[in-house]
Amino acid sequence: MNTVRVTFLLVFVLAVSLGQADKDENRMEMQEKTEQGKSYLDFAENLLLQKLEELEAKLLEEDSEESRNSRQKRCIGEGVPCDENDPRCCSGLVCLKPTLHGIWYKSYYCYKKRSA
């Protein structure tokens, strides 16, 4: 009976000591994998950031190009008084004398172009 207890105790001590070694090994392995994962995530994050910056630069370039070429300067909307000599009516509008309403305020207003 004593031999069984001694054998059991010996096996138990070996299992615990080897289990601790495996636990330490596993901890070190997990730490290495975590560090590798962090470096991979940093690399992926930097790559994504570069792509986003390139895309943003392209979009800003297109916006600035568009604003220089095709954007209208401030214009006067429909039904707003305008100057006959310097009409700044928006595109599609013409500076004309009013027919009925507004004849007592100013002499010209921006109206939609009439097709003939």
UniProtKB/Swiss-Prot annotation:
Disulfide bonds join C75-C90, C82-C95, C89-C110. Transmembrane segments: none annotated. Pfam families: Toxin_22. Residues 22-74 form a propeptide. It is found in: Secreted. Residues 60-69 have a biased composition (Basic and acidic residues). Keywords: Disulfide bond, Ion channel impairing toxin, Knottin, Secreted, Signal, Toxin. It comes from the Eukaryota. GO terms for cellular component: extracellular region. Residues 1-21 form the signal peptide. GO terms for molecular function: sodium channel inhibitor activity; toxin activity. Probable ion channel inhibitor. The presence of a 'disulfide through disulfide knot' structurally defines this protein as a knottin. This is U11-theraphotoxin-Hhn1b. It comes from Cyriopagopus hainanus (Chinese bird spider).
